[in-house]
Design a protein with these regions (language model features):
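Surface-exposed interaction regions that form or flank ligand-binding interfaces
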Residues: 3-5, 17-19, 31-131
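Active-site ExK catalytic segment of metal-dependent nucleases
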Residues: 10-17
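Polar interaction faces of repeat-based domains
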Residues: 20-24
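Hydrophobic, well-structured mid-protein blocks that either form specific transmembrane helices
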Residues: 25-29
């Protein structure tokens, strides 16, 4: 998770190697390895949204309503991601790879409502207590 003046960002990091395909609304995605072996795994975009919603709810209950966003990072070198969005939703969970990880930094630092300093301090205290 990343915490900055734009709120909290939950980052689901995956270390899969190969090509990831599917649709962002699918329950499972397909991973095709370089050997041709295929396996399915739970859609990390859905997984991270559940985590982000849980964190946002916990923060709101603690009296610190804070924007919480989520994203997915496939960190393994050479992993390619080919995901579609058949429903053309406006609020799609962003998916980043090692190659475009610098866009992830921009997403964390520049997307979302700017928090006041006291909100950031309160958020930090709550998160430290959650450890």
């Amino acid at each position: 998770m990343a915490l900055c003046r734009r709120g909290a960002t939950v980052i689901e990091v995956k270390n899969h190697a190969g090509t990831v395909t599917g649709d962002l609304s699918d329950h499972d995605l397909l991973l095709t390895r370089k050997t041709g072996a295929e396996l399915t795994f739970y859609n990390p975009a859905m997984q991270v949204m559940t985590h982000a919603q849980t964190l946002a709810r916990a923060l709101a209950e603690a009296g610190v309503p804070c924007p919480v966003k989520g994203c997915v990072l496939f960190i393994r070198e050479g992993t390619s991601v080919r995901l579609s969005d058949r429903f053309h939703r406006r609020r799609v969970t962003p998916v980043f790879t090692r190659r475009n990880r610098f866009r992830l930094r921009w997403y964390i630092l520049h997307r979302g409502k700017r928090l006041r300093r006291r909100e950031v301090r309160a958020l930090r205290r709550i998160l430290e207590d959650m450890k």
